[in-house]
């Protein structure tokens, strides 16, 4: 039984999230965006 709503819906796939920041992180899986980089090894991460 779900006790919360999922108002933030992905426009690319059927997934939905309860928080906007969760959706924002999920969208990166579709776009390939990696905005965070390690200052030690320079690898980029989502």
UniProtKB/Swiss-Prot annotation:
<dbReference type="InterPro" id="IPR050527">
    <property type="entry name" value="Snail/Krueppel_Znf"/>
</dbReference>
<keyword id="KW-0238">DNA-binding</keyword>
<keyword id="KW-0862">Zinc</keyword>
<dbReference type="InterPro" id="IPR036236">
    <property type="entry name" value="Znf_C2H2_sf"/>
</dbReference>
<keyword id="KW-0479">Metal-binding</keyword>
<keyword id="KW-0539">Nucleus</keyword>
<feature type="zinc finger region" description="C2H2-type 3">
    <location>
        <begin position="37"/>
        <end position="46"/>
    </location>
</feature>
<protein>
    <recommendedName>
        <fullName>Escargot/snail protein homolog</fullName>
    </recommendedName>
</protein>
<dbReference type="InterPro" id="IPR013087">
    <property type="entry name" value="Znf_C2H2_type"/>
</dbReference>
<comment type="similarity">
    <text>Belongs to the snail C2H2-type zinc-finger protein family.</text>
</comment>
<dbReference type="GO" id="GO:0005634">
    <property type="term" value="C:nucleus"/>
</dbReference>
<feature type="zinc finger region" description="C2H2-type 2">
    <location>
        <begin position="8"/>
        <end position="30"/>
    </location>
</feature>
<feature type="zinc finger region" description="C2H2-type 1">
    <location>
        <begin position="1"/>
        <end position="4"/>
    </location>
</feature>
<dbReference type="GO" id="GO:0008270">
    <property type="term" value="F:zinc ion binding"/>
</dbReference>
<dbReference type="GO" id="GO:0003677">
    <property type="term" value="F:DNA binding"/>
</dbReference>
<keyword id="KW-0863">Zinc-finger</keyword>
<dbReference type="Pfam" id="PF00096">
    <property type="entry name" value="zf-C2H2"/>
</dbReference>
<keyword id="KW-0677">Repeat</keyword>
């Amino acid at each position: 039984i779900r006790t919360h709503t999922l108002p933030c819906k992905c426009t690319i796939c059927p997934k939905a999230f309860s928080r906007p920041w969760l959706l924002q992180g999920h969208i990166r899986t579709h776009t390939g965006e990696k905005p965070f980089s390690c200052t030690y090894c320079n690898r980029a991460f989502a």
